[in-house]
Structures are given as structure tokens and as C-alpha cells.
From Swiss-Prot:
PANTHER family: ENOYL-[ACYL-CARRIER-PROTEIN] REDUCTASE, MITOCHONDRIAL (PTHR43981:SF2). Residues 1-14 form a transit peptide. The keyword Lipid biosynthesis applies. Gene3D superfamilies: Medium-chain alcohol dehydrogenases, catalytic domain, NAD(P)-binding Rossmann-like Domain. Belongs to the zinc-containing alcohol dehydrogenase family. Quinone oxidoreductase subfamily. GO terms for biological process: fatty acid biosynthetic process; fatty acid metabolic process. NADP(+) binds at residues 143, 169-172, 192-194, 261-264, 286-288, 343. The keyword Cell inner membrane does not apply. Homodimer. This is Enoyl-[acyl-carrier-protein] reductase, mitochondrial.
Length: 350
């Protein structure tokens, strides 16, 4: 009888978690492996057992797998920078969280969100409200937060001001459009030409983009005429680099600021000397990981609250395409295809 109780007790202490691990650094299609592992319910006093609900596949996740990101995740680590989960159990020393709370990563270090269940310390988790859709919460830490900080941390923008950005149909770009619209800031949005160009133009304008043009059109006199009635942009947001970044700098107002937060073209940001000397164009860089390292939880909460408020007012939405965790390979492939205009989010319980 006692042995039977021990077996039952043992079964109750363990559950299986499926996770996506980095087997090697290289192409995401070959560098990952899916494993099942046992997760114990017996956790230390400062730890929290979390059942993960959703996690997106971000470009930064793919860069980490490739070994080309600014931070390195060791081989054998679980992939995924952000996501959302529900607290299932807390250690005796945990004071800020309780069962059934929703949590996202604190973003102080790599999280490893592509798993169905995991144990983290309380300091690695950040509580979020339950009235926001969980698929939205899973993406809040990176793209919307980046967009918010780009609009707030570099130039003092007021209603009626103008900004210009490339990669405008990225998730950061779509977030910038909506956050700017909510503040009465006009956006000039540059996107790549291609078979989905007209669909992307329609999508961006529906979200509030004022002007949407192709990379090629920006270089024409017709573009200058198109924007001639607008104030010159005070801020340019660059996620591409190369010639695209150069063109953004030429459109900026004198004393304007070009902020680079990505390099999709893998080409250097090259600004003509005349832009620096005669027009005092400011060149800045932004890396979200560094921002999280240097700012407090209270400052992070303020950013999240501002975004949550717009979501509640239906002034901000995320274009999301959900995929079952059991169909991870298809989701990974879709995330690497350009032009679909939606964030791929894993449903980690399916």
C-alpha cells in the first residue's frame, strides 16, 4: 500500500514539457531540435512554475539561432525571447506572484519561451493584466515596446509633427504607425516594392499610415512633391540600412535624428558628410536588450501600460497568425517568408 502511494506521489510531481532547443548555431531549419523533458512540481522557494500559452517567432529569435545576434544563447538552450504564460505554482518565498497570474519575461536575460512549461525565478517574470488577449501579451515585450521607445526616447514629438520610417510593414513599423496616429503624429512609410505592394499599402493605410511609398519612389522628384505640403520629418527610423537609410537622412529636417534599430539589408548605414556638417543630422542606434538592462521595472510598466491602454481603446492592434506548437516546422517556415504581414505566434498548448 505504501509503495502504491509513493508511485502516485511520484507521478504527481512530474509533468512533460515540450521545448525547442538550439542544437547548433546555423540555419533555423536545421539547427533546432524538439525535445520532451520532465518538469518537477517541487520547486525552490524563489521559483515559479509556468505553463506557457503563446510565444511569437521574431527575427531576433532567428538571429540568435543563427549565432548573429548581439547576445549569445549556448547550444542546448531553449529558443524564444518572449511569450506569455500562466503561473501554476509558486515557491514559498515568492511574494509578487500567485497562481493563475499571467506573466511575460522580465527581459533582463534570455528567457527560452518556446516550451509548453518551465520553471523560472520570480525575477525572470513580469506580471501582466488578464484583460488583454494572451496572443497580444506574448508579443508585447519586443515589437510594440520598441516602437513606443523609438517614438519617445530620441526626439520630442508633438501633434502635427512628421516622422519617416522604412521596413514599415514589419511588426515594429505597424506598431509605430498606430502609436504615432494616437498622438496625432503623421507617418511617411517606406516599404519594398513587390507582388504584395498594393496589399501592403492598403494594410498600412487602414492602420493609420498617412503616406505609403516604395523604396524606389522615395528617390524620385515626384516623392518630394508628394510630401512638400508636410513639415519635414524630425525623426527617421531605420531597420534596413544601406541606400534606404541614406535616403531617409536626406529627407529629414535640419537637426533631425536618424535612429537605426535593425539592419535587414546587412549593408552599413552610410550618411553623406554634407548631411552631418551642413544639416547637423544626428545618427543614433537603439537596442532593446540594452534598454531593459538600464531601466527599472517601474519604467517598463509605464511603457506597457501606455500600450495596454491603447489596446483597450481599440486604437492599437497586432496582426497575428497563430500556429499549433505541434506544427512548429510549418510555423518556422512561414515566419521566414516575407510579405505575409502577420506575426507568427505559437499556441504552446496545442
Amino acid at each position: 500500500m505504501n509503495s502504491t502511494r509513493n508511485i502516485i506521489s511520484l507521478v504527481r510531481r512530474y509533468s512533460t514539457s515540450r521545448s525547442v532547443k538550439i542544437a547548433s548555431h546555423g540555419s533555423p531549419s536545421t539547427a533546432l531540435k524538439i525535445e520532451n523533458e520532465n518538469i518537477t512540481d517541487k520547486i525552490s522557494n524563489k521559483d515559479v512554475l509556468v505553463e506557457m500559452l503563446h510565444a511569437p517567432i521574431n527575427p531576433a529569435d532567428l538571429n540568435i539561432i543563427q549565432g548573429t545576434y548581439g547576445t549569445n544563447v549556448q547550444v542546448g538552450g531553449v529558443a524564444g525571447m518572449e511569450g506569455v504564460g500562466v503561473v501554476k505554482k509558486v515557491g514559498s518565498g515568492v511574494t509578487g506572484l500567485k497562481e493563475n497570474d499571467l506573466v511575460v519575461p522580465s527581459m533582463k536575460q534570455h528567457f527560452g519561451s518556446w516550451r509548453s512549461k518551465g520553471v523560472w525565478s520570480e525575477q525572470q517574470l513580469f506580471k501582466v493584466p488578464s484583460d488583454i488577449p494572451t496572443e497580444y501579451l506574448s508579443t508585447i515585450s519586443i515589437n510594440p515596446t520598441t516602437a513606443y521607445l523609438l517614438l519617445n526616447d530620441f526626439v520630442k514629438l508633438q501633434q502635427g509633427d512628421v516622422i519617416i520610417q522604412n521596413a514599415s510593414n514589419s511588426m515594429v513599423g505597424l506598431s509605430v504607425i498606430q502609436l504615432a496616429k494616437a498622438r496625432g503624429i503623421k507617418t511617411i512609410n517606406v516599404i519594398r516594392d513587390g507582388s504584395e505592394f498594393e496589399d501592403n499599402v492598403q494594410r498600412l493605410k487602414q492602420l493609420g499610415g498617412d503616406i505609403v511609398v516604395s523604396e524606389e519612389y522615395v528617390r524620385t522628384p515626384a516623392f518630394r512633391k508628394l510630401i512638400s505640403d508636410l513639415p519635414s520629418p524630425k525623426l527617421a527610423l531605420n531597420a534596413v540600412g544601406g541606400q534606404s537609410a541614406t535616403e531617409l537622412s536626406r529627407i529629414l529636417a535640419d537637426n533631425g535624428t536618424l535612429v537605426t534599430y535593425g539592419g535587414m539589408s546587412r549593408e552599413p548605414v552610410t550618411i553623406p558628410t554634407s548631411q552631418l556638417i551642413f544639416r547637423n543630422i544626428q545618427i543614433r542606434g537603439f537596442w532593446l536588450n540594452k534598454w531593459f538592462e538600464q531601466h527599472t521595472d517601474s519604467e517598463k510598466q509605464s511603457v506597457y501600460d501606455a500600450i495596454f491602454d491603447l489596446i483597450r481603446k481599440k486604437q492599437f492592434k497586432l496582426l497575428i497568425e497563430k500556429h499549433k506548437f505541434s506544427e512548429f516546422d510549418q510555423a518556422l517556415l512561414k515566419s521566414q517568408q516575407s510579405g505575409h504581414g502577420r506575426k507568427i505566434v505559437l499556441d504552446l498548448q496545442l
